[in-house]
Amino acid sequence: MADLMFIPLLERALQARASLFDARHETAFRLFNGFTEGEPNLVVDLYASTLLLHNYADDPTDGRLIAEGAAHFLQGQLPWLHAGIIKIRSSKSQAERNGYLLFGEKPDTKVREHDVWYSIDLTMNRDASFYLDTRDLRQWLIENSRDKTALNMFAYTGSLGVASLAGGAKRVIQHDLNRQFLNVAKTSYSLNGFPIRKEDFVAADFFTLAAKLIFE
């Protein structure tokens, strides 16, 4: 097993984020940011009961040992974890960059944040389909979107638009070039009981769409 000098860093991270855990294990947040917490080869995220480990090492083999050591430690600290995924950022393999199962059988497919459900697909691409660092922005949208109309450009999987609808927006148009990403947004709508209007999901090139909107 890898040098475990980073274990105290994980212990401090768990203590610092104790208030973010929820009793039902449905939420999502960054559990350990190695870039600022002492181990730049490792980032650990939590999505409901699924642990997501990012191997940022220049040498993937070195980073894998650290990630596996972290996974072993965190499984002991968080016994309710039922799956773990590792993403290897510098791998030549697309499958390894997207992530593969390290332990468990089935990763979570949804998380709840500020009482809103969001669909996730943790191995769909190199990212994890849900940006944790826009948590506060989603809360702001929930609090400030009532009766507004929103255009969510480069929507990715649409979490900002979902938050706007949860906040009472009259209409949200979700745009992204990738239709697969928008399908994740549609699943989020279904999870929250929001109506899915085909015309509100636009898979198109940004410049083509922008020109069309300007001249309408």
Region spans (language model):
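Conserved SAM-binding motif I beta-strand of class I
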Residues: 171-176
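Conserved class I S-adenosyl-L-methionine
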Residues: 147-156
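S-adenosyl-L-methionine
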Residues: 178-216
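Non-catalytic accessory regions of SAM-dependent methyltransferases
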Residues: 1-50, 56
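Cysteine-centered catalytic environments shared across enzyme families
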Residues: 7-26, 64-86
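Phosphate-coordination loops involved in phosphoryl transfer and adenosine-cofactor binding
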Residues: 146-147, 169
